[in-house]
Amino acid sequence: MLVHPQFNPIALDLGFFQIHWYGLTYLAAFGLFYFLATRRIRQAPYASGSGPAWTARDVEDLLFFGVVGVILGGRLGYVLFYKPTYYLANLSEIPAVWKGGMAFHGGLLGVIVAMALFAHLRGRKFFEVTDLVAPCVPTGLAMGRIGNFINGELWGRAADASLPWAMVFPQSGSDLPRHPSQLYQFALEGLALFALTWFYGHSRSAHVGADGRPIWGRVSGLFVGGYGVFRFIAEYFREPDSFLGLLAFNLSMGQWLCVPMIVAGALIWWSAGRRRV
């Protein structure tokens, strides 16, 4: 059995300015997105597309839109999905993102709106944009889970002490051995989802239909559905939010939010080959 090392959340303290590890993981996430996206636009189908050529400047603008979507959507998602009653009574607390409280599912909705706006302003197809973005996101999710682990937050459910990697999280207020669910999510939502979407996104079947015409949306559908499946699995090992607990059928809020993602992902993938570009 292991004990969480309780890392110092501050990576660098200059006295007048502090740099937190969690902030560095966000910086790494944005850097990885830029690196992967600029590489992806130089490869098929983007390098050989019939529409306007993609440039590094486009990726920079896309990243800006995405960051705004993540912050606004992530915060509003947490407010609406997890603590609507509290924030309805404390409206001034809604903008206080520095106090914590972000939701992935809300962030995803925010990014979808941001990508739709970007596509409209640039005269591009919506799924052309999201198919570019989708494989570049999981590495950022992986960095976020590393940040959660460093902070010793979002720990897992109680585990059998005989499990070699069972870990005590002192921040939980108990000495129960727990699943290091942050690392499970790092592996599933980060590494596995990245491998799945990146390699599929470079395959011919992802962008060319059976009749040889170009298609968009399959990579996006795989990302949405794949994340839903991986997160649904990981939630069985993650401690439910104390203020919510388990809901109907002993599923967590995270799992219930993943159900429509799985359905939507499957529908997006299935319908992609039936839309004419």
Curated annotation (Swiss-Prot):
Its main location: membrane. One of its GO terms (molecular function) is phosphatidylglycerol-prolipoprotein diacylglyceryl transferase activity. It comes from the Bacteria. It is a multi-pass membrane protein. Signal peptide: none annotated. It is found in: Cell inner membrane. It holds the Pfam family LGT. One of its GO terms (cellular component) is plasma membrane. Keywords: Cell inner membrane, Cell membrane, Membrane, Transferase, Transmembrane, Transmembrane helix. Catalyzes the transfer of the diacylglyceryl group from phosphatidylglycerol to the sulfhydryl group of the N-terminal cysteine of a prolipoprotein, the first step in the formation of mature lipoproteins. This is Phosphatidylglycerol--prolipoprotein diacylglyceryl transferase. The lineage of its organism: Bacteria, Pseudomonadati, Pseudomonadota, Betaproteobacteria, Burkholderiales.
